[in-house]
Amino acid sequence: MAAMFNHPWPNLTLIYFFFIVVLPFQSLSQFDSPQNIETFFPISSLSPVPPPLLPPSSNPSPPSNNSSSSDKKTITKAVLITAASTLLVAGVFFFCLQRCIIARRRRDRVGPVRVENTLPPYPPPPMTSAAVTTTTLAREGFTRFGGVKGLILDENGLDVLYWRKLQSQRERSGSFRKQIVTGEEEDEKEVIYYKNKKKTEPVTEIPLLRGRSSTSHSVIHNEDHQPPPQVKQSEPTPPPPPPSIAVKQSAPTPSPPPPIKKGSSPSPPPPPPVKKVGALSSSASKPPPAPVRGASGGETSKQVKLKPLHWDKVNPDSDHSMVWDKIDRGSFSFDGDLMEALFGYVAVGKKSPEQGDEKNPKSTQIFILDPRKSQNTAIVLKSLGMTREELVESLIEGNDFVPDTLERLARIAPTKEEQSAILEFDGDTAKLADAETFLFHLLKSVPTAFTRLNAFLFRANYYPEMAHHSKCLQTLDLACKELRSRGLFVKLLEAILKAGNRMNAGTARGNAQAFNLTALLKLSDVKSVDGKTSLLNFVVEEVVRSEGKRCVMNRRSHSLTRSGSSNYNGGNSSLQVMSKEEQEKEYLKLGLPVVGGLSSEFSNVKKAACVDYETVVATCSALAVRAKDAKTVIGECEDGEGGRFVKTMMTFLDSVEEEVKIAKGEERKVMELVKRTTDYYQAGAVTKGKNPLHLFVIVRDFLAMVDKVCLDIMRNMQRRKVGSPISPSSQRNAVKFPVLPPNFMSDRAWSDSGGSDSDM
C-alpha cells in the first residue's frame, strides 16, 4: 500500500469514494428513525369546535394505508442504496489491490539484475555461486526520459541496453514488441523484448553476431520497416537520457541517442524460446548458450554453402596401406573463415582474418583509367623489375632498355586523352590506384615519357629488322645462283619435256619447246595404265638410271688412265659376267645417291621459298618513315626536358637514314636478279599482281616430290633383293648397297620416309 500513496491521485480517489459511500448511509438512518415520520390530517375549519360524538367506525382507516405504502418505498430505497454502496466499495477495494500488485511487479522487474558476459573471449572456468555477480539496483537507480526508463550496462566490452516503457499504449495492450540495437559498424545486434503484463518472463538479451562490442552510443531502431498505425508521426521524440550508472566500471559510459526509425534496417532472426519462470533471479542464473564453433576453425553450426569441387570418391583398401591412411592423422588445417570468404556463395559482410576490422583500401581507390585496364597496367608494372626512379633516369639520359621491357611498356601506353586526364588530377594522389599513381608521377617527371619509349622501341627493333632484311636479300641472291648453276635440275626438266611431248604427240600440246613450271607439281597425278606407278616415278627412275650409267662410264674412263691395272681388269670382267638385269640394278644403285642429294644442293632455294616478298619490299620504306617521325617527335622534347636522350637519338636517326638508303639499293639489285632468273625458266611468268618469288616455291615442292620417289625406288630394290634366291655366282659377285651421302635423305625426304623401318 505504500507504493500507492506515493502518487496524489489515489488519495483523492479514495476521499471521493468515501463521501459517496458515507452519504447514503446517513440518509438511510434518517429514513429508518420513527421520529422523522409525521402524519398530517386535514382540518375542516380553524374554529375549535369539537366534533360530534359518532361511533368509531371507518374514519381512522385512510391514515393507516398511507403510512404502510410510504414505509415500503423507504425500505426499497434503503436496500437499493445499500447494494449499490456495497458494489462500489468492493470495486474500490479491488482497484486499490490491483494497483498494489502492479507496483510490486514493477519493483520486482527492476530488482535483482544479473550481469554476465555472454561471449567470453576464452573458455570460462566452471561456474560457482561466488563467481556470479549479482547487483540489485534500486528503482530510483533508473533514469527517466520521456516515457522510457532504462540503464546502460557495459559487460566486458559488450554493451547491453535494459529498458522499458511506462504509460505506453503498447504495454497496456499486452502485446510483445522488439527493438533492434545496431552499432555504428553493424558488427553486432541485440534484440530486447518487452514482456506482457500478464506474464513474468524476464527480459532476454540475445547477441546476434560474434565479435567485439560496439560502443555505448548504440542507436535503437525499430524492427518493423513501417511504423505501426497506432503510433502517430507527430509523437515527439524523447530527449537523450543522462549518463547511466555503470555496473562493473567506475567511469560512467555515455548514453545512447534517442531511437531512430530506419526502414532499411535488416530484420533480426526470430527470438529463441524463453522459459516461463516466475522469479527473475532463477531464470537469470543460467547464461544464454554461446554460439557453437566447428572443428575446423571459423565454421559455425550453420555452414556457409561453398562452391563444389567435382571429383570421384575412392574407397580406401583395407588390405594394404595407402597414402590416404596418413592424411586423417595429419596436422594440416585450413582457415574456414577465409575459405568461406573466398569460395562461399554468400560472402557479403564476411571479413578475412588478415583484414580484421580494417577497411578494404581498394574500395577507396580512384580509377582514372578503365578499371580492367588499370589492373592489367598494374600487373605489367610490377613485372618490370625496375622502379619509377630508374625508369625516369633512363628516359632522360637515353640509356638502353631491355627489348622485352620496352614492349611491355608500349602495350600499356595510355592514349593522349588518358594522359591529359591523369595530368589534370588535382586530388590526393595517395587515393589513386597503383597504375594511376605510377603514371601520374611518371608523366609529371617526364611529360613525353611514352614518346621517348616509342623512340627507344624503334631503336631496339631497328637493328634486328635491318639484319633480317639483309639476310633475306642474301638468300634470294644465292637461290638465283643455284638455279642457274645446277645441271641435274635442268636434266630433270629435259626428261619431263621429252616425256610430255611423247605423251602429247598428235595434239595441240605436243612438240613443246618449254612448259610452265607449275606442271611439275602435276606429274604425280598422271598414273600408269595399271595404276602402280606415275609419270613422276617413271621420269625420276630414268634419270637415276642415266646417272648410274654416267657413273660407270666415268669409272671406266678413269680406269683407262691406269693401264694394266688389276682393278680395272677385275671390274671390267665383273661387268661382263653380270646379266642385263643385274646391270640395271647396278645403275640404279649408283644413280640414286646423285639424284637423291639434289634437294640438299638447293638449300638456299628452299629458304628463298619461305621469304615473304611483301615484307622484304616494305621493310626499308617502313624504317624510313618511322625514322622521320621519330626525328620530328624528338625535336619537340629538346626544349623542356633535354638531357642526353635528344643528342643520342638524333645521332642514331642520322645513321638510320644512311643505312636505309644503302639497303634500298641492295634490294633493287636482288629483285632484278630474281626477275631475270624467273624469266630464264619461264618467260613472262612475272606479271603485275603475282609473287615474283613463286618460282622458288615450285622448285622446293618439286624437289620434295623427287626425294619421295627416290625413297620408293630404294625400298623396291630392297624387297626384290630379299625375295630373289641367291645363286652361287651372285654369292661370289655380291654387290653391296652403295654408301649414300649424308645429304641423301635430308629435309622433307627424310620426314616422308617414316614407314621405311617397317618395310625393311
Curated annotation (Swiss-Prot):
Keyword terms of this UniProt record: Cell membrane, Membrane, Signal, Transmembrane, Transmembrane helix
Composition bias, Pro residues: 52-63, 253-274
Compartments reported by the entry: Cell membrane
SMART domains per the UniProt record, alphabetical: FH2
Signal sequence range: 1-29
Region (Disordered): 52-71, 204-313
GO molecular function terms listed in the Swiss-Prot or TrEMBL record: actin binding; actin filament binding; profilin binding
GO cellular component: plasma membrane; plasmodesma
Topology of this chain in the membrane: Single-pass membrane protein
Transmembrane stretches, start-end: 78-98
GO biological process: actin nucleation; cell tip growth
Domain FH2: 296-732
PROSITE patterns in alphabetical order: FH2
InterPro entries in alphabetical order: FH2_Formin, FH2_Formin_sf, Formin-like_plant
Its biological purpose: Might be involved in the organization and polarity of the actin cytoskeleton. Interacts with the barbed end of actin filaments and nucleates actin-filament polymerization in vitro.
Subunit structure: Interacts with profilin.
PANTHER family for this protein: FORMIN-LIKE PROTEIN 8, FORMIN-RELATED
Family of the protein in this entry: Belongs to the formin-like family. Class-I subfamily.
Protein name: Formin-like protein 8
Protein encoded by which gene: FH8
